[in-house]
Amino acid sequence: MRCPFCQSDDTKVLDTRLIDDGSQVRRRRECVSCGERYSTRETVDLNLPHLIKSDDSREAFSEDKLRSGLLKALEKRPVKTSQIETSIARIELKLMTQADREVSCIKIGEWVMEELKALDKVAYIRFMSVYRQFQDIEAFKKEIDRLMR
């Protein structure tokens, strides 16, 4: 791996650790040429199924879209970045273990709601209100009452 500071190819690994429940490898590196230290993260390059959208069109799974949706729901909520990354990894694992090469966006949405429900109930309600297209306050009240039981 090239040094991000001097672009040298001559680097060495000082430390290697598993992070995010073993879904990533963090390596601490040092450039032999300039002496700068930096960290890298490695993840598996996945061949994930395509998603079937509500209009029956297909699109490739996008981790960025998944992350963006989670971050919108979790905006200004007390949830650590590491918890969000772990949730993303769990959703991707579910996606990888699907036998089908195409998965409905509805299923992805359900998985996101499961993760948000475990992380933060307010974020869960935020996401659900958009995902399920709540039309009035009664829909919010009904879901909050269901959560409180």
From Swiss-Prot:
Signal peptide: none annotated. Binds 1 zinc ion. GO terms for biological process: negative regulation of DNA-templated transcription. Keywords: ATP-binding, DNA-binding, Metal-binding, Nucleotide-binding, Repressor, Transcription, Transcription regulation, Zinc, Zinc-finger. Negatively regulates transcription of bacterial ribonucleotide reductase nrd genes and operons by binding to NrdR-boxes. Belongs to the NrdR family. This is Transcriptional repressor NrdR. It comes from Ruthia magnifica subsp. Calyptogena magnifica.
